[in-house]
């Protein structure tokens, strides 16, 4: 896949786009997600977004999430408030018709700086794009290991390939078959990101 945006810095497995949205669109997203009536859901397992155990464990990855689209189907009335971003993705050759999952995630400040459990967002070949809504810390870690090489679970000690330090209005793009981890912000009060998964 070729990305043609002039602000896109390309490495072998990882790409980042600075200043992805204009200021007006940035403010629109912040106003949406920080509005007191926006429906965030609590999860005790922020990696998957679903926790059937409902027991708080010492290693629980607690956060908030909102799913806009899943398995290619719109599942939130707020999708209309965010779909304008798809025009910007098409400018870098990520096509809206290939979007299979769209989810916002929110982590609050936590002293634990360790990366969360390595995971992939989908089992099929896909490209993952993570957009940072606010200025925050809490690195995104991408590993060498892929779902193809470890189809059921990431190795216990995966090999770190790239570490992306988040910043407001930046976009991280990578092959979604690579295991990756989010992490809590330890300095800023919250980390707000939107994850897009595009089928390859």
How would you name each of these model-derived features?
Residues 1-2, 151:
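Short hydrophobic/aromatic-rich motifs at helix boundaries and adjacent loops
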Residues 2-96:
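Non-heme Fe(II)/2-oxoglutarate
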Residues 75-200:
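Catalytic core of non-heme Fe(II) oxygenases with the double-stranded beta-helix
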């Amino acid at each position: 896949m070729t990305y043609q945006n002039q602000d896109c810095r390309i490495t072998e497995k990882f790409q980042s786009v600075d200043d992805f949205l204009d200021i007006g669109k940035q403010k629109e997203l912040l106003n949406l997600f920080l509005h007191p009536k926006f429906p965030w859901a609590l999860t005790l397992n922020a990696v998957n977004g679903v926790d059937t155990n409902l027991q708080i464990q010492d290693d629980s990855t607690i956060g908030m999430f909102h799913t806009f689209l899943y398995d290619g189907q719109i599942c939130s009335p707020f999708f209309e408030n965010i779909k304008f971003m798809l025009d910007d993705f098409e400018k870098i050759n990520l096509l809206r018709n290939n979007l299979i999952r769209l989810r916002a995630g929110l982590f609050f400040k936590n002293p634990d700086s360790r990366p969360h459990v390595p995971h992939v967002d989908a089992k099929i070949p896909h490209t993952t794009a993570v957009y940072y809504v606010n200025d925050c810390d809490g690195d995104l870690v991408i590993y060498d290991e892929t779902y193809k090489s470890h189809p059921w679970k990431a190795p216990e000690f995966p090999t770190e390939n790239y570490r992306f330090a988040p910043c407001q209005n930046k976009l991280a793009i990578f092959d979604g078959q690579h295991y990756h981890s989010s992490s809590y912000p330890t300095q800023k009060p919250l980390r707000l990101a939107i994850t897009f998964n595009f089928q390859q």
